[in-house]
Amino acid sequence: MRTLFGSLFVFAALLLGITSVQAQMTAPPGYYKDQKVVYHNDGGAPDNAAYFRKLLTNIKNHIDAVGKDHVEIRVVDHGDGLIMFQLANNDPDLAHRIDALKAEGVKFLICSNTLRERHIDWHTLYGVKEDDLVPSGVAELARLQQMGYVYIHP
């Protein structure tokens, strides 16, 4: 009986070690080709804050995997997706994540239709500049896909 438990313990330890190595695995150089990607952010109710953190983490992981010089990322924000920039005004962690991704070259694009329909002044959205505004979020998603961007909706 002791031998059985001892063997199971060793097996479990080995399995955990393998899992740990896999979690730290990085792609070899050249594994990923250059990429153009558009992420679709329309919010994640009922817990928008958790959804936004997951979205930004996915984007960061994407950049880390491919390399910032090998990926061009746009994030089209419309509907409840604009809540991310409202929350970031009072959430330093969320603001930092947005800023860090911008520093990596990520461009956040804001839907003017949503601004108009919800009576939101873009000046009140964290880090948004006039150049970030697009006429229509969904039309921008289609335009970017026509330009060869791969669509991702986490």
State what each model feature region is.
Residues 7-17:
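Bacterial N-terminal signal peptides
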Residues 1-5:
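Positively charged n-region of N-terminal signal peptides that target proteins for export
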Residues 41-55, 85, 89:
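Short, glycine-rich nucleotide/cofactor-binding loops
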Residues 30-46, 76-80:
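Acidic/histidine-rich, surface-exposed loop or edge segments in extracytoplasmic proteins
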Residues 87-154:
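A cross-taxonomic marker for long C-terminal extensions/tails that follow the last structured domain
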Residues 72-86, 114:
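Acidic helix-start/capping segments at beta-turn-to-alpha-helix junctions
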Residues 18-23:
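Sec/Tat signal peptide C-region and signal peptidase I cleavage site
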Residues 51-67:
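Histidine-anchored nucleotide/phosphate-binding helix
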